[in-house]
Amino acid sequence: PSLVGSEMCIRDSHATALEQKGDGYVVASLGEESGYVPYTAFSAKKSYLEAHPDTVQAFVNALQRGMEKVSQSTPEEIAKMIALQFPETDEAVLTAIVRRYVEQDTWKTDLIFSEDAFVLLQDILEEGGELTNRVAYEELVNTEFAKKALER
């Protein structure tokens, strides 16, 4: 964590734990302020997509079903589903984090990586000094499988 005066920038689990103990409170969320930025992305070579479209589609369909399950569940249910991934985080803290994410509309309900989100991601990477040359959306992003997953 970074401490600046009486403010600090820390992970949600730590911020929520402090908040629940009455030792602090969350005043802003980077996720809420930034807009939709993909936290996780999957990549494959074009040759793999062409050689194994059924495998790729099955994988994307499973991810889409997971996103639908999350969007149809309560924060308490989601916290129980993901608890094994966060063994160091108390279930009440995890539920509070999930509730905040739900209230902020942090999670999309589909896997389509929009051009706006792609531009925003490149803006962030460029401002952070991690990107020197931008790439065209059409050159790097394939939404074909995500769109088909929504049709099933």
Report residues per predicted region.
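Single conserved hydrophobic/aromatic residue that forms the stacking wall/gate
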Residues: P1-G5, C9-I10
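Extracytoplasmic
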Residues: S13, V37-Y39, E77
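Solvent-exposed loop/turn segments at secondary-structure junctions
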Residues: H14-A17, E32-G35, Y48-L49
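Ligand-binding "clamshell"
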Residues: A17-G31
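N-terminal secretory/targeting leader peptides
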Residues: G22-Y25, A41, P87
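A bilobed periplasmic-binding-protein/Venus flytrap-type ligand-binding module shared by bacterial periplasmic
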Residues: P38-D54
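Secondary-structure end/capping motifs
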Residues: E50-T132
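Conserved C-terminal helix/tail region of periplasmic/extracytoplasmic solute-binding proteins
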Residues: V119-R152
